[in-house]
């Protein structure tokens, strides 16, 4: 007698601003998962995505096309994309009919890059909420470009956006600093990498901003934003280079812990293996240190020395 098809499915909702590397992440992660023996289905939820580099199991473009919407309704790219997401929200039976035959696969959802969809517009959140009711356990994987760390003002903005996304999307959440191999192409980091990944004492960033004549006028605003971020104490990041298998493994370990895949029934796992997967994501200092040595130029001063000079 054949076993029943699994009812619970797992996956990642890959979100983030345009250019953060979502599609490249889906390609790299899908190849990595297949190498581990997982059956993977990549679902494109971005109607603006063209020339996809990965094999697409489900494409929202079959339901609604961004170009057609823009022409028919005389909308711009942003307005057209919002309409497409609202149209998908109103036709979730189409999406479920596409996903149900793929039960037993691990899903990667390549989502649109418009920030408002993840910070205050309700369509994408409603779609995710409905999928969880279909017993699809998702982790939101939020990518932001790592080069924002080189600019204190932009990093504070990234922290605010990440926090707003975490509160709005309402899914288990993993934040990634993508393109780690390019992190210092736009300037040197003021602090060690773990300062940014663990979001340590942000008062140091305020001191750096105070040295800029433009941002000195906005010190009180920046202080309030920093206080808000620290009061919630939710945001942290995992550094990612999608070309580095060890880096992908660290991300996957955190995602598996967040959506419960490491405790799933599809694979036989010993208690030791499950505890290793569950706990390992919390102790990645050595991995972060290794990435710093690999991608960042040696710093001549410590954080404490720099702080004393401010």
Curated annotation (Swiss-Prot):
GO molecular function terms listed in the Swiss-Prot or TrEMBL record: GTP binding; GTPase activity
One of the Pfam families matching this protein, by short name: ATP_bind_1
Motif (Gly-Pro-Asn (GPN)-loop): 76-78
Keyword Acetylation: yes
Residue list for modification N-acetylalanine: 2
Keyword tRNA-binding attached: no
Residues bound to GTP: 19-24, 178-181
Site (Stabilizes the phosphate intermediate): 78
Record field: transmembrane: none
The entry's keywords: Acetylation, GTP-binding, Hydrolase, Nucleotide-binding
Function statement: Small GTPase required for proper localization of RNA polymerase II and III (RNAPII and RNAPIII). May act at an RNAP assembly step prior to nuclear import.
Subunit (UniProt): Heterodimers with GPN1 or GPN3. Binds to RNA polymerase II (RNAPII).
Family to which this protein belongs: Belongs to the GPN-loop GTPase family.
Stored PANTHER family: GPN-LOOP GTPASE 2 (PTHR21231:SF3), XPA-BINDING PROTEIN 1-RELATED (PTHR21231)
Protein name, as recorded: GPN-loop GTPase 2
Gene assigned in the entry: GPN2
